[in-house]
């Protein structure tokens, strides 16, 4: 069974626009949950930067949701791990609860129809080709 991705109202920096998952219908979304204490998250950021750069023009949107309770920890992480994609802060865990995941990081690939199509628990560099193939398969599908 394929589920629709939950629509959420995230906590964003004061100068950011609200983020509505409905705004991304017709695009493929890589929604990644991460935390400052997560070592595999550090490894995933360069890959997400590269995939956002190469696949963004083809319709991929990368959104990384931070689940730290302390925003300063997330900001310190981002000073050392540059992000060329959207960052959302979820210190209360409201967004994370809607997606009900256990591992860190966890990525959800959401199809153009707004349904969760793939779930990747953890980040493993040796699986990057599979992550890429999953994204390409969704980008190749026609929008509803």
Where are these regions (language model features)?
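Short pre-active-site segment immediately N-terminal to redox-active cysteine/selenocysteine motifs
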Residues: 27-29, 33-37, 103
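Thiol-/selenol-based redox modules, centered on thioredoxin-like
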Residues: 109-144
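Hydrophobic beta-strand core positions in alpha/beta domains
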Residues: 30-32, 64, 108-109
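Short, internal strand/loop/helix patches
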Residues: 75-113
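Bacterial N-terminal signal peptides
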Residues: 1-10
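Structural signature of beta-strand start/N-cap positions in the alpha/beta core
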Residues: 27-29, 59-61, 86
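A short beta-strand-turn-helix
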Residues: 10-29, 55
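Conserved redox-active cysteine motifs that mediate thiol-disulfide chemistry
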Residues: 33-50
């Amino acid at each position: 069974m394929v589920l629709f991705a939950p629509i959420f109202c995230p906590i964003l920096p004061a100068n950011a626009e609200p983020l509505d998952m409905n705004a991304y219908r017709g695009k493929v979304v890589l929604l990644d949950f991460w935390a400052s204490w997560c070592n595999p998250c550090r490894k995933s950021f360069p890959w997400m930067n590269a995939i956002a750069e190469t696949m963004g023009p083809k319709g991929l949107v990368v959104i990384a949701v931070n689940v730290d309770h302390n925003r300063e920890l997330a900001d310190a992480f981002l000073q050392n791990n540059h992000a060329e994609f959207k960052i959302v802060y979820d210190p209360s865990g409201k967004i994370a609860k809607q997606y009900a995941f256990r591992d860190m990081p966890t990525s959800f690939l959401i199809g153009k129809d707004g349904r969760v199509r793939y779930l990747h628990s953890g980040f493993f560099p040796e699986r990057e080709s599979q992550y890429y193939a999953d994204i390409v398969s969704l980008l190749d599908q026609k929008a509803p």
